[in-house]
Amino acid sequence: MSFKYLTLLLATTSVNSFADVDLPSGDDWLNHVTNGLAPYWLMESAHGQPAGNFPTFRCDNGVILDPQKPCEELNKGWISPHFDREYTRMKSRQAYAYGVLFHLTGDKQALELAKKGAYYLIDHLQDEKNGGFVSFTRSGKPGMEWQQRTSQDQAYALVGLAMYYYLTQDPKVEQALIDQQAFIFKQYRRSDDRGLAWVLKDGDGESEKQQELVAQLDQINGYLLLTAPLLPEPAQAKWKQDLEWLTQVMLDNYHSDKEQRFYGAIHHKAVMMPDAKHNDFGHTIKAYWMTYLTGQLLENSNWTEFGFKGMKHTLKQAQYQQNFEQVKALFSPEWQSKWAQESIPAWQSRPYKHYSSSWEWAELDQAAMTVSLVDGSMKETLQYTLPTFMDVWVDHQYGGVGPKAQPTVS
């Protein structure tokens, strides 16, 4: 869920510094949002019962999942065992999406849905007995003991609240944010001070021995950076202090100066290997990006410089040249004609993989835009990768970026 800063970049990406490059215009971005993404999220089936209780599982055409007759795109071995779960993080992410839609277009229906989603999270998915938010429910009941919930789940429960607060400074949402952040940093802070724990008790396939990058990173990305500057004192000072501590933890424990990347986890040598989970360019670029933005917020020039250099190095490593003729079938006729016989820049998730997921592509694009707003160095790449995301990854029939989005592969 790192799209929040994209909304701040869009207003400036297509102006003076990029005037000599054929990048998407403001109208192109609005078309991407209103015609490419919004239809999937504004259809009635997305609103939930009651509105704000957004459904976790919907098919590509927007229909709510029937577990007895699942659509092909959801009938996968890694998804189907969890059809009985309603995930808090999914509801929060959807509330966030409505906030972004309003932020870019002024759509009042989207703002109302963002509010309903935020209020549903607060009113129904907080654990009033133990603190925090439930990770998922089954038949309306919490699915795990509170100590088995991941700190990442606790962070993502706040994504939608953070965006709605960014737009409105709603006092009810403000208090929920302050309470939840305090809960996370009290309960999950490791006794050795090496960051936030993943879980506090083994369960649901997770272990308290795990030390995960995203336990740290997604606090920063999910809510701290967006809302810390808006909070009243003393909460603002406390959040900035925790943000500073967490960023330093990430740099001290998860970054490899030798390999110039972030480890996805550090509890065993195997999880630090380049092909292990979360050891991809997406997580590394996001960690550098968050370090850069944190440096700006806290006026730490060392972090700003470190994050900027890290982004530039990672973007270079993540880019490869793709023969367009091999992938042109994925593109609309406009781009098939415009890029015929060319070799185009593309993003990959790991060295020499020539593959990327939609979220990895988006994060690399966002970092590339950030870099180019400073020195213009990525604009030649962005004139290809931005239209590729809009054209290849978006479902042009029903809207949204779904599980059947196709990567550019050789």
Positions of PLM-derived features:
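Short linear sequence elements within intrinsically disordered, low-complexity coil regions
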Residues: L8-L10, D170
